[in-house]
Amino acid sequence: EWLVVLAGWLLLSWLLPLLLIDLDYLWLPEPLCRVGLLLGLGMTAIIGFQQGEAVGRALLFHHLLAAGVALVGFEGVSALAERLIGKPALGLGDAKLAALLGAWLGLTGLGITVVLAVFGGAVVGSIGRLSGRLGRHQPFPFGPFLAAGGAAVWLWGHDFWLPLLGLVGPTP
């Protein structure tokens, strides 16, 4: 459907500058995250309500819930890390980007995105540390991993990622 293709182009076009800004400046601009979240909810509503009012309401609720879970979850992890190790483990921009992705991808898509982002960040961080390019306490951005994970989930879908990540068994 053309509307889903348009939504995909919009999402990917929105994630690219966020990825690049975070890589360069370790910063995710809140206005870009906020507008991206609203665009995600708007596209979700348009696509959902085209399938009927009940579907539209359910889909919009699901994606709103995912955005809220992302925001609270990421801010909670950051606050817990600050309490345990004396500094936040994530920037608040990461929480806002995760909320944006929840608005676009829903709970399942958000979960897959986070798994991909954590794995990607761990691999790149480990390589950076082992190669000496990343210092022991040197921060590096997590936003690009979230953005790339979200893009991968949008492009290949849940059915591709869930079995690959071992989160569900093969379909009979």
Q: What feature does the model see in each segment?
A:
Residues 38-39, 70-72, 146-155:
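Hydrophobic cores of alpha-helical transmembrane segments in multi-pass inner/ER membrane proteins
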Residues 7-13:
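Transmembrane alpha-helical segments of multi-pass small-molecule transport proteins
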Residues 45, 75, 126-130, 154-158:
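Membrane-embedded alpha-helical segments of multi-pass transporters/permeases
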Residues 148-172:
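C-terminal domain-closing interface element
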